[in-house]
Amino acid sequence: MSILEKVQPIETMLPERYYTMSTEDMEKRVREIKEKMGETLFIPGHHYQKDEVVQFSDAAGDSLQLAQVAASNKEAKYIVFCGVHFMAETADMLTTDEQVVILPDMRAGCSMADMADIEQTERAWKELTKLFGDTMIPLTYVNSTAAIKAFCGRNGGATVTSSNAKQMVSWAFTQKERLVFLPDQHLGRNTAYDLGIPLDKMAVWDPHTDSLEYDGDIEEIQVILWKGHCSVHQNFTVKNIENVRKNHPDMNIIVHPECCYEVVAASDYAGSTKYIIDMIELAPSGSKWAIGTEMNLVNRIIQQHPDKEIVSLNPFMCPCLTMNRIDLPHLLWALETIERGEEINVISVDKQVTEEAVLALNRMLERV
């Protein structure tokens, strides 16, 4: 079941008046509430959020940075998370019971996270155990549900982000002979390959057919990749790179490792959202860059670096649609309900799930 199926209508019904308010009036009200609430309110915002939302973030970052920020914040009573559902779940699990995590729009899910549900994962683990016994350890990208994080926690595994994937995959191989990486096959493949594992020692698990996709002796398999992907980064292609090389031969190409292996291999650089931001920041004035990641972030980088020539690797790219569900009207609505003493769209993860998921999260956080 996806998060969209779990949404209660009352939680996502933005009152009509927010559609008719001017941007200026909404921004004014957000500032007033932030000033009034002070440190009792904390607004983390992911880099992929719209500018209209990011401008009010108390901390902006990628998944790892926001997880660390959530874990360290003990002052705020209300954490209004401007990101997607799995990020708000992570914040809820890493904060105290007294802190309340709110997602301004409960429809802000993640298609990648929905590509691995707990029933599929338990079934896959059972079948893979028949083949490989006790030789596997699971790692899950943080872009996954709390239930999947809990699965990894109780099976000795951990979470990873694109910033620390190499560290965590290296650690995993000190624990077991084989790695099961979910839900993003591309990050898993690119990371394992960077660490020297040949492509022919990687298999793919298809959760829809409950089958292992691999040609060869299965005893040779070191990495089992879940057949999932990011719908945004899937849209960057080798053809995009060929077009840039042809029309702008002096342009650097930098992409996110959620792109497929062929795109990453053909690029000049690949790394996390933070890595991309830092690379552009440190690049010399006049340098040229084609960036393969989410469009809101690319546009923000372009605005912040007018001294550099920067374009999207895919000129027809669109933003992450679920991230974009968090907008200024929904942010203001969430804040005004808090101001009235109400709590809507509260993210509350089951206690048992939290305990097991935190095991996986802490195995990551203590190593980065």
UniProtKB/Swiss-Prot annotation:
Disulfide pairs here are: none
What metabolic or biological pathway is this protein involved in? Answer: Cofactor biosynthesis; NAD(+) biosynthesis; quinolinate from iminoaspartate: step 1/1
Name the positions where iminosuccinate binds.
46, 63, 141-143, 162, 256-258, 273
Main localization of the protein? cytoplasm
The cofactor binding remark recorded in the entry reads: Binds 1 [4Fe-4S] cluster per subunit.
Could you tell me which InterPro entries the record lists for this protein? NadA, NadA_sf, Quinolinate_synth_A_type3
Q: Where is it found, in Gene Ontology cellular component terms? A: cytosol
Point out the coiled-coil segments of this chain: none
Subcellular localization is given as: Cytoplasm
Fetch the Pfam families from UniProt: NadA
Keywords on record: 4Fe-4S, Cytoplasm, Iron, Iron-sulfur, Metal-binding, Pyridine nucleotide biosynthesis, Transferase
The UniProt catalytic activity note for this protein reads: iminosuccinate + dihydroxyacetone phosphate = quinolinate + phosphate + 2 H2O + H(+)
Q: Which residues bind [4Fe-4S] cluster?
A: 110, 230, 320
Annotated GO biological process = 'de novo' NAD biosynthetic process from L-aspartate
Per the UniProt record, which EC number(s) apply here?
Answer: 2.5.1.72
Q: Which cofactor is essential here?
A: [4Fe-4S] cluster
What is this protein's function per UniProt? Catalyzes the condensation of iminoaspartate with dihydroxyacetone phosphate to form quinolinate.
In the record, the note on similarity to other proteins reads: Belongs to the quinolinate synthase family. Type 3 subfamily.
What is the name of the protein in this document? Quinolinate synthase
Which organism is the protein's source? Bacillus thuringiensis (strain Al Hakam)
Q: What is the lineage of its organism?
A: Bacteria, Bacillati, Bacillota, Bacilli, Bacillales
> What gene makes this protein?
nadA
